Design a protein with these regions (language model features):
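Basic nucleic-acid-binding alpha-helical/helix-turn surface characteristic of O6-alkylguanine DNA
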Residues: 1-113, 164-167
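Thr-Gly-centered strand-to-loop micro-motif
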Residues: 103, 133, 147
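Regulatory, non-catalytic segments
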Residues: 114-126
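Short Lys/Arg-enriched helix C-cap and helix-to-coil transition segments
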Residues: 130-137
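…primarily DNA-binding HTH/wHTH and HhH modules…
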Residues: 140-167
């Protein structure tokens, strides 16, 4: 697994943490994560397909955050994610840009209507947030629920999509 530092220069408050990290396998992106102080920031030398996947993901995430991209085409590698969680994430990936669905909605589509809490847990463990848009999944009562990058970022990602979806 290779990693690439993804620096985002922006005035948006939900990205006041100055950068994200990406990890990939030869099959696709395996992780999107917030880089925190104290982590090794030395450059990683990627090669071949992994390097291309990381470059593509960086470009697509920057376009998304600039409101210029509504879906991702970069391959994602969820092979290490348990089957139920993978199915829930694949369903979340189908939620249209600028829209939200509930944890229960996903559970029902998976044929497990009583598994809304398990869907919530799957979203909380999403290894590739933003690319697989778990921020578009909310509680049935309309409350946001949780988000691995924090609720303020979830709110801001949803607002970004609402704002750019209006055009």
């Amino acid at each position: 697994m290779e990693q690439l530092d993804l620096r985002l220069e922006t005035q948006k408050p939900f990205l006041s943490v100055s950068h994200l990290g990406l990890a990939a396998s030869h099959a696709g992106i395996t992780r999107v994560f917030l880089r925190r102080g104290g982590m090794d920031r030395s450059p990683i030398r990627e090669a071949g397909r992994v390097r291309e996947i990381l470059k593509e993901a960086r470009r697509e995430i920057k376009e998304y955050l600039a409101g210029k991209r509504t879906f991702f085409t970069v391959p994602v590698d969820l092979s290490q994610v348990p089957p139920f969680e993978r199915s829930a994430l694949e369903m979340a990936a189908q939620i249209p840009y600028g829209e939200v669905r509930s944890y229960k909605w996903i559970a029902e589509r998976l044929g497990k209507p009583d598994a809304a809490r398990a869907v919530g847990n799957a979203m909380a463990r999403n290894p590739v947030p933003i690319i697989v848009p778990c921020h578009r999944v909310v509680r049935t009562d309309g409350n946001l629920g949780g988000y691995s990058f924090g609720l303020i970022r979830k709110e801001n990602l949803l607002e970004l999509e609402r704002r750019h979806n209006a055009y």
